[in-house]
Amino acid sequence: MSDANLRARIRMSTVYTVANNLGYLVVGTDNAAEIHTGYFTKYGDGGVDLVPLANLTKREVYEWAKALGIHEDIINKAPSAGLWEGQTDEIEMGTTYDMIDAVVEGRLEEVPNKDKEIIERLHRISEHKRHTAAAPPKF
């Protein structure tokens, strides 16, 4: 996992270098499901200036993609961070985006206990990713 996180951080450093040279901001692609579960690399793909999809579930992202005319091959491709061959988000997390979306939307009655436990654990262990670095109080 540390190798995959390193790759994400190197990729983000490259993106920021290009953005800085061109005077651009870096836009992230994380959605509500990924943010809730912490399915992003701290200071990697999570290190961006803007996160326009942050309040959209994965389902809503797909709906927007269809409405915007994004090619079906892209929409139907299994979500993957692309950090190693054959990797998919859902296999790595052990649950589906449909289940995560249901939790994010408060539809807990639709989520089997096994999936709830996985999603709650992912949320709990990734809490540090959703906050800026802690600083001591000023004395």
Where are these regions (language model features)?
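ATP/NTP-dependent adenylation/nucleotidyl-transfer catalytic domains that generate, transfer
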Residues: 1-9, 13-16, 20-25, 29-139
